[in-house]
Regions:
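Bacterial Sec-dependent signal peptides at the C-terminal "C-region" and cleavage site
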Residues: 6-27
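A short, amphipathic beta-strand motif
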Residues: 29-37, 47, 144
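Beta-strand signatures of extracellular beta-sandwich domains
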Residues: 46-50, 90
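Short proline/glycine- and polar residue-rich coil/turn motifs
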Residues: 67-74, 135-136
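Exposed aromatic-hydrophobic patches
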Residues: 75-82
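A short tyrosine-centered beta-strand micro-motif
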Residues: 85-91
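Acidic, glycine-anchored loop motifs typical of Ca2+
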Residues: 95-103
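Extracellular beta-sheet/turn segments enriched in Thr/Pro/Gly and aliphatic residues
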Residues: 112-149
């Protein structure tokens, strides 16, 4: 885990933002991301897909993002096509729909968030290596359990 303050993820990370189109590649594989333990069955869940260590958790540096409405459910599956290689996912759920992650006075999220590999940061933001998974063939399933904010 990097020693960067967890606040970097929350303040400088700027996870919430406009969605971007999926990457285009001729060598993509079907991947299913399953997200469970949603706190709200109506608030939008945003998924940010990263494929570089340098851009991980940096505002606007994700390869692409997706927004999903839970439609009354506490879990969902999102099929995506990803180029082969290393990937990591960061997830947020904007409970009050203000298009940002709300934080307490020390910068810890008060709204739900999660990372691939179900990494649970304590004092510092996770790094790409902790969250990465390998896309090396079809049928990959990435299961992520949302962590409620404080």
């Amino acid at each position: 885990m990097t020693m960067l303050p967890f606040v970097t993820l929350l303040v400088g990370g700027g996870l919430l933002g406009p969605t971007a189109p999926a990457p285009h590649s001729t060598e993509t594989q079907a991947v299913t991301v399953t997200v469970s333990s949603l706190v709200s069955t109506t608030s939008t869940v945003k998924l940010y897909f990263y494929n570089t260590r340098a851009g991980f958790l940096k505002r606007g540096q994700w390869a692409f993002s997706r927004a999903v409405k839970p439609e009354g459910k506490r879990a969902f599956s999102l099929p995506v096509e990803l180029p082969q290689g290393e990937w990591a996912v960061a997830i947020t759920q904007d409970l009050n729909n203000n298009d940002k992650i709300d934080k307490n006075f020390v910068g810890i999220p008060t709204e739900p968030y999660a990372f691939s590999n179900n990494v649970r940061p304590t004092v510092a933001a996770p790094d790409f290596n902790e969250c990465k998974f390998l896309v090396d063939g079809p049928g990959k399933v990435v299961s992520i359990v949302l962590k409620d904010g404080l």
